[in-house]
Amino acid sequence: MAEPATQITLIGTKLATIGMEFIFNGPTPECESCKLRNTCMNLEPGRRYRILGIKGELVHECPLHEEGVRAVEVTESPTIAAMDARKSFAGSKIIYEPINCDVTDCRMYDICHPAGLKRGDRCTIVEVVGEAPEECARGYKLKLVELRR
């Protein structure tokens, strides 16, 4: 599998740590007039990213981050998700469909509907991690898989 693409973006100095993962939420009203907006807002909202490296020591002023922002290199993080066991094969290319379940107070709900993935995303099952940590309340046979867009 090809190495995931990397991007340079800006993140709050306090958050700029190699290995840190975050979900990019998109711009706020304060960002509209910022001269760094294009560099800060070059990620896709709702996606999970991991910081691979810090680029230099320069700190830029930011109205949202009291200690400013720094340039970092990021990549989209793989996601652990629960999937139908019958469709869980390492190396498979899939179109992601979350488990059809609306039991939002279930302890498995977040792993069945992981943040960072959207219905219809084209993904590769990098690895079948193992069995789901609990039985499904709806009776589905689930496996945990690592997915990469």
UniProtKB/Swiss-Prot annotation:
Source organism superkingdom: Archaea
Pfam families: UPF0179
Family recorded in the similarity comment: Belongs to the UPF0179 family.
Name of the featured protein: UPF0179 protein Mthe_0220
Organism: Methanothrix thermoacetophila (strain DSM 6194 / JCM 14653 / NBRC 101360 / PT) (Methanosaeta thermophila)
